[in-house]
C-alpha cells in the first residue's frame, strides 16, 4: 500500500514537472514577397517553439507599435511547443525600419528582431 502511494506521488510530481519546462521562442521576420520600394507587401513574424503559451508579440515600424496587425490562432506542435504568425500589410521604402518585438517568460527583457529586406 505504502509503495503504491509513493509511486503515485512520484508520477504526479513528474507530470507536474512537465508543466514547468520553458522554451524560448524562435522569431522569424520576413516579407511575403521580395521587397520592392513603393510596392505593397505583407510583413510576417513567425514565432515558434515556445512554452508556456503566454506571449506578447508586436510588429514595429521605426520602433513604434503597428496597430493594424492580424494573427493566426495559437497552435501547438507535436512536442507541445506553441507557434503563431503575426502579419500586416505594409509598403516598404528605403527609410522605414520594421521589426518584431516579443515578450515571453524566458526573456528577461523583450527581444526585438529586425526585418532584413534582403531575406
Curated annotation (Swiss-Prot):
Swiss-Prot/TrEMBL keywords: Immunity, Immunoglobulin domain, MHC I, Secreted, Signal
GO biological process, alphabetically ordered: antigen processing and presentation of peptide antigen via MHC class I; immune response
Domain Ig-like C1-type: 25-114
Subcellular location: Secreted
Alphabetized Pfam families for the sequence: C1-set (PF07654)
SMART domains (UniProt xref): IGc1 (SM00407)
N-terminal signal peptide: 1-20
GO cellular component, one term: extracellular region
Coarse class of the protein's main subcellular location: secreted
Record keyword Cell membrane present: no
Paired cysteines (S-S): none
Matching PROSITE patterns: IG_LIKE, IG_MHC
Family: Belongs to the beta-2-microglobulin family.
Subunit structure: Heterodimer of an alpha chain and a beta chain. Beta-2-microglobulin is the beta-chain of major histocompatibility complex class I molecules.
Function: Component of the class I major histocompatibility complex (MHC). Involved in the presentation of peptide antigens to the immune system.
Protein name, as recorded: Beta-2-microglobulin
GN (gene name): B2M
Amino acid at each position: 500500500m505504502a509503495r503504491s502511494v509513493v509511486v503515485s506521488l512520484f508520477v504526479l510530481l513528474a507530470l507536474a514537472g512537465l508543466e514547468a519546462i520553458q522554451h524560448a521562442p524562435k522569431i522569424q521576420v520576413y516579407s511575403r514577397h521580395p521587397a520592392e520600394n513603393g510596392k505593397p507587401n505583407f510583413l510576417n513574424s513567425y514565432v515558434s517553439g515556445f512554452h508556456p503559451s503566454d506571449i506578447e508579440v508586436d510588429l514595429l515600424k521605426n520602433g513604434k507599435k503597428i496597430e493594424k496587425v492580424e494573427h493566426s490562432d495559437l497552435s501547438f506542435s507535436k512536442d507541445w511547443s506553441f507557434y503563431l504568425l503575426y502579419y500586416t500589410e505594409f509598403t516598404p521604402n528605403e527609410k522605414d525600419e520594421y521589426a518584431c518585438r516579443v515578450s515571453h517568460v524566458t526573456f528577461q527583457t523583450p527581444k526585438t528582431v529586425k526585418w532584413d529586406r534582403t531575406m
